[in-house]
A protein has these predicted regions:
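Extended catalytic core of nucleotide-activated donor transferases of GT-like folds
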Residues: 2-92
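Short beta-strand scaffold positions
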Residues: 85, 220-221, 239
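Alpha-helix capping/helix-boundary segments
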Residues: 89-91, 134-135, 225-226, 244
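Nucleotide-sugar-dependent
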Residues: 172, 176-213, 220-228
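Conserved catalytic-core segment of nucleotide-activated headgroup transferases in glycan assembly
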Residues: 112-180
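A short acidic/histidine/glycine-rich donor-binding loop in glycosyltransferase catalytic cores
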Residues: 233-239
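Donor nucleotide-sugar binding/catalytic pocket of nucleotide-sugar-dependent glycosyltransferases
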Residues: 81-95, 100-116
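A charged, aromatic-enriched C-terminal amphipathic alpha-helix characteristic of glycosyltransferases
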Residues: 240-247, 254-290
């Protein structure tokens, strides 16, 4: 790793274009280590720059074994003029941990920009899951009535499971396949929501943005940080179990599906155009300049 002087020289190069009093958006973590991040922030302070910290993930909450580092992260966040947090739940958690920044903005949703023509989703009673079965092993035993298609290499499969594996595909291919019709499943690493680690209810899922960008409705667990947004805009269904998820798909009519798809179509335009990122960044700049 760099010595203090080497790191300082490297940061001077990275920050060469930052002028006195500029607004700087700093996305954390950089995964370069806390020493790097703190040194970067200290140099910004010398330039009297306005610092907006865009909190993507919080390592001490992501990894319980790192929780002892929480005070150091809070101290780093507290040097910001404004912070952007993924969710209201994360805001409340960080405030409880000692966050004192007055200007806190909530991201709520990831965008999913793309530039390719997609299919018009057709009614199909099936669920998609985009994610590695290695990380979500309980899905390999899916035995509900609704078929589940998983975009992941096949693991040792359970012959009783109602699952098919689609392998890894590129991002454009994934959007094209999803857009043919069906519903996208967002779920945590545990089958039973009561066993789910707290973090999954604090951050925001990239999966929900992927499915919605593809134009298909989503089924999400009630503990998901933006479940209320999905319910409020009628973009799919909020459930408390996988059994309930399957039951909803089995009882869904073609008319209900198409009505939901129409709502998703309007919403997906925002994700395609990067609306959520643009809005929260513009709002953050306005906050620190006002």
């Amino acid at each position: 790793s760099d010595s203090q002087s080497e790191m300082s020289t490297r940061l001077d190069g990275i920050m060469a274009s930052v002028g006195y009093g500029d607004v700087v958006i700093y996305q954390l973590p950089t995964w370069n280590g806390r020493e790097f991040d703190q040194a970067f922030i200290s140099k910004l302070k010398i330039l009297q720059a306005k610092l907006v910290t865009f909190i993507h993930d919080v390592p001490p909450l992501m990894f319980p074994s790192n929780y002892y580092l929480m005070p150091e992260y809070i101290d780093m966040y507290n040097q910001s003029d404004a912070v952007i947090v993924p969710s209201e739940q994360m805001r409340d958690k960080l405030l409880a941990e000692g966050l004192t920044v007055d200007k806190i903005l909530v991201q709520s949703m990831w965008d999913h920009p793309y530039d390719l023509p997609l299919h018009q989703p057709q009614f199909a009673r099936k669920l998609y899951f985009a994610g590695s079965v290695e990380r979500f092993p309980h899905l390999s035993n899916w035995s509900y009535a609704t078929p589940l298609e998983i975009f992941s290499p096949e693991e040792e499969s359970n012959p009783e499971a109602n699952v098919s594996y689609r392998g890894w595909v590129s991002r454009p291919e994934l959007l094209l396949e999803l857009s043919k019709g069906g519903l996208g499943l967002v779920w945590g690493v545990e089958e039973n929501p009561a066993d789910e680690p707290e973090y999954y209810g604090l951050n925001i899922s990239h999966k929900s943005a992927t499915y919605l960008a593809a134009g298909i409705p989503v089924i999400v667990p009630s503990y998901l940080s933006n479940a209320e947004l999905i319910r409020e805009h009628g973009l799919g269904f909020v459930v408390d179990s996988l059994e309930e998820a399957s039951r909803i798909v089995e009882s869904l009519t073609a008319e209900e599906y198409q009505a939901t798809v129409e709502r998703v179509r309007k919403f997906s335009f925002l994700l395609k155009e990067g609306y959520f990122s643009k809005k929260v960044l513009v709002d953050a700049v306005m906050e620190v300049l006002s």
